[in-house]
Every structure is written in structure tokens, then in C-alpha cells.
Amino acid sequence: MRRALHLLALAALVVTVSARAPVAEGATPAVDVPGPGSTVRVDAAAGEFENGSVIVRGVSGHLAVRLGAGSAPLLQDALSVLRLTDTQVAGRAIGDPLPPLTQRATVTGHRPVTLVLRFRVPDATPPGIYAGRLDFSRNGHGFARVPVRLRVFGVQMPARDDPTAFRTLFLIQPQTYLAAVLTGSGIEPQSGGPGIVDRLYAFLSEYRVSPGDWGFGTPWPEGYVDRTGWFRAAATRMAAEGAYPFTAMRLPLGTQRSPASRTGQSARTPETWTAYLTGQVLPFWRDHDWLDRALVWGWDEPGPVYGRQYAAPQACAAHAAGVAYLTTGAPAQRIPARRVTIPWGQGTRSFTIRAHGTGNGFLWDDRGCDDVDIWAVLSRRVYGSFATPVEHRSHIDVQRELRPAIDTARARGASIWSFTYESKAGLGSPGYAATEPATDARVFGLWNALEGMDGTLYADGMVSYGGLDPYKRLTQHGQHVLIYPALASTDEPVSSLRLENLRDGIEDADLARLVVARRGRPALLAILARQRIFSIRGNRVLLGCTSGCDLVTKTKYAWPRYRHGAGTNAALERVHSALLKALAPVPA
């Protein structure tokens, strides 16, 4: 099972494993294993990361965990032990950074310590049960032994560069990450810079997160040439960064919100794009076999006016170069005015419901060169919204009125993705803020699979530290930081509790899509309904909003109720196991 979650959720389901020996200070240390039994149990597919967790209590001093003698070699190679630590977010301490235990081994006081046990299961791992034992010690003296069992199913995760898998695109600023690591380690950029950046992109690839920025690999006006200095060597840096497998490869053209680029290109002058792409960019990408995953993201939420002025000519420019075009926004049609008659006292009364919505059918009419290939739709705008009293009494169903346009664009060949940003109170769908339950990120991945999304985009950043030490404090609600700086210049980036859930959500989305492809959507609905992940009745997803939806909730936009309280992590683990069981026999 996968475990990576908040201390309160973990503490709700624990079984204490008795200590082997008392500690010198007189306290009796113990290791709690969430869930039934005293064994850490992890279910996984080949090519997947999976987490277990334990809570260590009653320990002060130097804490160490290692695999005991006789443990399966796969476990020896795959295990990383991470320690959940706190940072300040919106005025309170929140458990989020996950540095390696070896670099945060000193435990002070008697506060419980949550450890995340991260297993990386290699591709093509044979199905079976891989058993071992975790030995816990304090100041070199053992105090507990805990069995561990990794159960690998006969399921292979999609390749990390498979464009038919669940795709991702996350904005990230490698320059900001590099500066943070250099500040913490005190080394000079010229001696450690390339390695630090390479480890960042390798880490993103392992976690199935495709970068929305290539940083030092961004080409110059003359293309991929190496200028003086490693950070100006565009060809060398892009070859290194792009060598890691990603499902999506964003071409170096920004949106209207992007800072000035060293390419010299602008989102407002798409008439120069085709020549730049075909002459300076695509030959390099073709030589590296990246074109099957290439896309242009050129405008953020254009609306009908900017859609005609910018998104449409951008799409034509991308298509003239032979690459896909993405925009954030939704296929939309204007809802015409309607005259309705409703019961009123002893008689009836007529009302006019005004026309509303903005149409952008010219971007998905299957005519001309300007159709959008990939729509990244804000999750809260996938269905519809609340009904007014007149609409409600007229039996007009507005909770799903946005879906027909999306479904039509999909039927005409468009790929539909999702995107999200900070989920403020009442907006009605999960996001990646540190002030939300960490499980929201994983639930969001399952929702994407449930609604047939082909990918997801995130534009709030992953390493935007705002000049702060992220180990001490995050800006706003933490939504701009999903990765923490490596604690040593030669280390990989430090994960977060939210990023572990995000990665799990991406992997679950891939597994869920496989279940739908092989067994149909009802099979996925049944798995999710059994664990109450979403409001599902029969084969129908029930939506909630303030008025006129299937359910009454506090949200303006229609969205299913989703699980986010105590017990959510355990329920998600059961969903993960059920997905694996739906795809392959249980290993013996």
C-alpha cells in the first residue's frame, strides 16, 4: 500500500510494535504501523513509486533505519527513508518537506516522528512478494524491528515518455531552484550548476512531471547554439535536460504571462513563430526524437476576443510548423436566452432567462487551421454551476451545461486536459496548496481519470520560493512550492508530502485509465464508489453546488463531493490496490 500522509490521518490507524529494548533515558520507544497488522505492506506495479509509512515514538537522539539482513535485494536497491518535517504556511506549522532521514536524523524531545518509506519499483520487475525487515536504532542501539512486504503485481506502468499515457505539464523555474541550492551549499555555480539542474530534471522525470520550462536549455534567436558559459550553452543544456523521458515536451514559446525570453519570440507576434520553429528549433528536436511529444502553449485563458486575436493565429502558426497547440480554457458555446413559464401562486408566470456564456466555437469547429489541439480546462469549469430559483423551478439543468461543448470538441479530435490553481474556500475542487489536505492532490489525479482527461497542467510553479527559506516558511498558501532545495549540491531535490500525493495521483490516473480501457468506466466507478472517493450512485457521478445540483454543497460551481477527511489516505490505498487487482492476479 502507498502511505504518505498527514500525521493526524496516520495516527488514526496504528498498531504498536513493541520495542526490542528500552532506551537509556528510560522511555520506551516504539514504532507504529498505520493500518491493520504490524507489517508495512506496499502494493505496486512495475515502474512505479510506492510509499509505506511508520510513526516512531519515544525517541531522542540519532535515529536510523535500515533494511535487515536477509531482506529481498529489490528492497535494498529501492528503499529511501524520508522524514516528514514542518514548515510555516499561513501562520501555522504544516508537515510537508520530506528530507532524507540521513540528513535530518537528530530527534529532539518526545514528539512522534513520521517516516515515509519510498520504494522505487524498476520497470519489468517480475510479479511476486518481496519481503524484508526494517531495523530501527537510536544512537547506534537497536530498539525495534518491523516486517515489510512489497507486493508487485503483473502490471507495467506506461513508459515515462509515452505520449498516450496521462500527460503532465508543470511550470518550473530551474534558475530559482539552482539559486536556492547554491545558497544552501555555498558552492559556486560554475562548479556545481549543471549537475544540480540535471538532478532536478531527472527527479521530475522519475515523478512523471513534465517541465513547462527548459531554463538554461532555452534557445537563442539563432537557435540551439552554445555561447560562452555553461548557463549560456543552450544546445548542451537542452540535450541534457531533454534526455530524461517526459510525456510532454513544451516548445520554447511562452504565453502572454511569460517573462521576456532569450528566444526573442513573443506571444503577441505569432506571425514569426513558424519560421523560428522550423528554422531554429524543430531540426534540433527532430534529431533528439522529441517531436511526438512536442506542443506549444502560447496563451493563458484567451476568451473569445483574445482567442481570435492571438490564440487562433498561434494555432495556425503551430500547425504550419507541424506541432500541436495547447491553450488553457474550455471549449464554450453561448447559451441563448430562454423564455420559461413556472407555477406562480394559483397560476403561472413567465420569465426570460438571459443569454449567458461566451462562445469560442471558431477554435473547435473542425474547420481551418485554428482549431486548438489540447484544451486544459479549469477543473471547476468542467460541469456547470448553481441554478437560479427560476432555472430550478423551470427544471433547467445547468449543473452540466458546460459539458456538451467540451464533449463535442473531444469528438472532433481535441484532447482535453485539466488545470487547477489554489483552491480557496468554496471553490469546490481539490488543488495543491499546503493548507489543503495532502490527499487532495491524489484525489485530483483520480478525478482526471474518471472524467477521461488526457493530462493536467499546473501554472502556479513548483520552486517559487519568493526569497524565503522554504524549510522555514512558504509564501501565501504554499501553492508555489512542491519541491524543496536539495540539502547538498550532489543530492536529488527534496520531495514534499503534496508532491508524493501528486505523483501517486498521476500513477493512479494511468492505472485507472488502463482499467477503463480494459473493463469499462463502470468498473472504475465501482472502485471509487466503494471507498467513497467521490459522490457516485450507480454509474452516475453526483454533482454538488448551492442550488439546482444533485447535492447541496457550499460551492458555486458544480463538482462532485470528494473525500478529504480522516481515513482518506487509507481509502486511497485501497483504491490503488483495487486498480491493480482489476488489471492482474494477486501475486502469491
Regions found by a protein language model. Give the residues of each.
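Surface-exposed binding patches on compact interaction domains or structured appendages
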Residues: 22-37, 49, 59-117
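Conserved, mostly hydrophobic/aromatic
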Residues: 54, 134, 296, 448
